[in-house]
Amino acid sequence: MDLKDVQPYIEGKICMVTGGGGSIGSEIVRSLSKLNAEKIVIVDIYENGAYSVKCEVGDKVTVEIASVRDYEKMDCIMNKYRPDIVFHAAAHKHVPFMELNPEEAVKNNVKGTETVADLAEKYNTDNFVLISTDKAVEPISVMGASKRCCEMLSLIHISE
C-alpha cells in the first residue's frame, strides 16, 4: 500500500495510538508522522518504548503513561486530546505467557478494548482502528480468543 493513498485521511488529524511504544504501535506512530498528522498521542503503560519513539519522531508526539484498563484515566486522556482517530494497538500478545495468565489476557486485551472503544464512541472519534492478529481466526489459544473477543466488541460498537 502506498502511504500517499492514506495521507488525506491522516493529514492534519489528531491521532491516538494505544500501545504506541510497542512493536506495532511504534510503527504506526512513525507512519502517522510521515503522513503529517497534526498531533500523535501515545498512550502506553511502559515508558521506555514510548520515550524512544518520542525521541525519534519529535515534538509532534505527546506521551501519556496509562493503562487502557484504567477507564477514568483513559477518559481524562480522551477528553484532553479529543482524537480524530484512535489506533488501538495496546495488548498482551505473547501466546505462551497468556496461556499461563489467561485472566491478564482478558483484563488487558478485552477490557482494554472495551474501555478504548467506549471512550472513542463517547468522544465522537471519527475512526477507531483495532490492531488484531491472525491468531483471532478460529482461535486455539487464550491470546487468540481474547483478540477475537476484541474484534467482536469493535463490531458491536460499529453497529450501534
Please give the residue ranges for each predicted region.
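A short, basic/flexible loop-to-alpha-helix module at the beginning of a structural domain
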Residues: M1-K13
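Conserved S-adenosyl-L-methionine
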Residues: S33-K39
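Conserved Rossmann-fold cofactor-binding substructure of NAD(P)-dependent oxidoreductases
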Residues: I65-I85
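Residue-level detector of conserved catalytic or cofactor/ligand-binding positions
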Residues: I156-E160
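N-terminal Rossmann NAD(P)H-binding glycine-rich loop of SDR-like oxidoreductase domains
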Residues: T18-S33
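Helix N-cap at the beta1-alpha1 junction of Rossmann-like dinucleotide-binding domains, i.e.
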Residues: Y46-G49
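Conserved Rossmann-fold NAD(P)-dependent oxidoreductase catalytic core, especially the SDR/UDP-sugar
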Residues: R82, H88-R148
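Conserved SAM-binding motif I beta-strand of class I
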Residues: I42-V43
